[in-house]
Design a protein with these regions (language model features):
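Conserved alpha-helix/loop element of class I SAM-dependent methyltransferases that forms part
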Residues: 13-33
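A short SAM/SAH-binding and catalytic strip from SAM-dependent methyltransferases
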Residues: 98-111
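A short glycine-rich, Lys/Arg-flanked "PGG" loop and its adjoining helix->strand segment in the class I
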Residues: 113-125
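Conserved Class I S-adenosyl-L-methionine
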Residues: 112, 168-240
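Class I SAM-dependent methyltransferase SAM/SAH-binding core
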Residues: 36, 42-89
Length: 240
């Protein structure tokens, strides 16, 4: 039996940050008719997969994110239907999609198990469930956890995904890949974190020197910049 890959393994495939759309295409192939991206945020990944999937729908509970996604799709001339909807209560009939996707979103679901059950419900027989999640390990995770610790929610998402096996879903593939994240400075990373969620400011303010020291200690130094490998897991499941 092939041993499980660990986040520090050198054999984990290295991909440029932002190459997850190409990775999805490699796994899903061309010609899929209809895909749903659950928790799509501002829709960058969703717009990317529209290049090789016939009809693409993206949903998110945040109206602001959906408005930005629609504006970007219009500006780029990409045909994607963005809707405000919860991943735990999807407004489609059983078996409506032949691909359902969680791209870095399953751990953000209030109830991952319920969201996965809904995903399985709207997935057609023979369809593919594509789940990409950041792994709760490695130096980037350690550095970021000081202001946004997602260890518990990522673990809960992983447990929920595995609990679906044998309930009409089977795992076709499990892949680990790493992307290099490079920041010009600590302040560059801080700005990135605050853009993601302003609520993280309180963590920075509580121990500014400690957060900075920890971040810089964990980073690789590359030409005066601070770099990390972030590890992602991509699971591809099929519906019988």
């Amino acid at each position: 039996m092939r041993r499980a890959l660990k986040p520090g393994d050198s054999e984990i495939r290295a991909l440029p940050l932002g190459a997850n759309t190409k990775f999805a295409r490699d796994l899903l192939g061309d010609g899929r008719a209809r895909a749903l991206d659950i928790g799509c945020g501002e829709g960058k990944f969703t717009r990317g997969i529209a290049a090789f999937i016939g009809e693409v729908v993206g949903v998110d509970v945040k109206e602001r994110a959906i408005l930005k996604a629609r504006a970007a799709a219009q500006a780029e001339g990409v045909a994607v239907d963005f809707q405000i909807a919860s991943g735990e209560s999807l407004p489609w009939a059983d078996g409506h999609f032949d691909v359902v996707i969680f791209s870095n979103s399953l751990h953000h679901m209030p109830d991952p198990a319920k969201a996965l059950a809904e995903a399985a419900r709207v997935l057609a027989q023979g369809g593919l469930l594509y789940v990409m999640e950041p792994v709760a390990a490695g130096h980037y995770h350690e550095a970021t956890s000081f202001v946004n610790d997602e260890t518990i929610v990522r673990t809960q998402a992983w447990v929920a995904l595995n609990s679906m096996l044998g309930q009409g879903l089977s795992r076709a593939q499990e892949n680990l890949y790493r992307s290099r994240r490079v920041f010009a400075s600590f302040d560059d990373w801080k700005d990135d974190q605050l853009e993601r969620d302003e609520k993280r400011r309180a963590k920075f303010d509580a121990d500014p020197d400690g957060v900075k020291t920890r971040f810089e200690m964990l980073a690789d130094k590359e030409d005066g910049k601070l770099a990390f490998d972030q590890v992602f897991r991509v699971d591809l499941l099929t519906k019988a």
